[in-house]
């Protein structure tokens, strides 16, 4: 029985054009994201088999595989909803996302400073990775994380609310080796309503985290 399932896209393949082509969206969701879902489910089965047989020789690889595939599934599930064909601009109070706008200004000094930091974090990933805006519960502030692969270089307890996929499969068919151009273009499809909802949800869960005895 599968624990994880591939979510449906919240729009059709052409919804984000011309920023992201229909071909990329279809391949990215139906093949790449699906592979992470399958990988997570397969690894859970392999871990269950290892427990049943008490054979732990491959535990290091299995735990690493689970982190890789599960994190890939989670980040992509956020990624699809973080984008919309009528998005872009910046979060503004008049659009009902004023609290997010205030949090960005408090955490980064200005929206321009935040945009520059997240753009640079995503565009300068070495190899495969992500640029992520995350809520950090200890300080109650927003931070930018530069994630290696899907799971490395992450602050424990942080919650991703806006993710930029910097893996080549996210852009190469359209942007070739111009990762910076892709990241710059991504700002035109950011769904600030979705990011704001994730910010509010992340804040509301802070009190349930046992951060200290």
From Swiss-Prot:
Binding note for cofactor: Binds 1 Fe(3+) or Zn(2+) ion per subunit.
Principal location listed in the UniProt entry: cytoplasm
InterPro entries, A to Z: Fe/Mn_Superoxide_Dismutase (IPR050265), Mn/Fe_SOD (IPR001189), Mn/Fe_SOD_BS (IPR019833), Mn/Fe_SOD_C (IPR019832), Mn/Fe_SOD_N (IPR019831), Mn/Fe_SOD_N_sf (IPR036324), SOD_C_sf (IPR036314)
Domain of life of the native organism: Bacteria
Induction of synthesis: Inhibited by nickel.
Catalysis performed (reactions): 2 superoxide + 2 H(+) = H2O2 + O2
GO cellular component: cytoplasm
Keywords from the UniProt entry: Cytoplasm, Iron, Metal-binding, Oxidoreductase, Zinc
Subcellular compartments: Cytoplasm
Cofactors required: Fe(3+); Zn(2+)
Assembly and binders: Tetramer.
Family, per entry: Belongs to the iron/manganese superoxide dismutase family.
Function: Destroys superoxide anion radicals which are normally produced within the cells and which are toxic to biological systems.
Protein name in the entry: Superoxide dismutase [Fe-Zn] 1
Taxonomic source organism: Streptomyces coelicolor (strain ATCC BAA-471 / A3(2) / M145)
Taxonomy of the source species: Bacteria, Bacillati, Actinomycetota, Actinomycetes, Kitasatosporales
